[in-house]
Amino acid sequence: MIKNERDLWKLLKKSSAGILFDRIENWAVPGVPDLLGYNQNKTFFTLELKLTKANKIKFSPHQVSWHLRHGPGAFILAARSMNRDKNTTVAKMQHVGGLRAGGPTHFFLYESRQILDLVARGLKVDPIVGGLRIDEIIKFLNGLGANAPRP
């Protein structure tokens, strides 16, 4: 069960065969994403971790600015917690994801370029990958740079 971003980090670390993750100390440079990843294709990427109980995702102004300035290779992983109570309001969505209170955790991966939509519309924005399991997100991140020429 995921209760906070630390639990999301632990799940990601445990599930991410083939990807090396380094956790970044964010107090040094505000807005820098939580993780630096390096996959089996020798591709670096960043990952901002977010946990929410409803559709709204909270970002600091520094995080928004960072994602606006960085393009490909910067991602946001949002998890909607199963710890929603009966009073939590969630909007109906067309993409992958359960919406009932008390339902399972769902994972959503977004590109950096989607940051302004995420601030405005939260999880109503279609993810590039999403679902009940984190495996598909790991598969996507592991595939980054697969078509790039190797040295």
What are these regions (language model features)?
Residues G31:
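Beta-rich catalytic cores
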Residues L35-G37, T43-K53:
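Conserved catalytic cores of phosphodiester-cleaving nucleases, focusing on short active-site segments
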Residues T52-G71:
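Mg2+/Mn2+-dependent nuclease catalytic core
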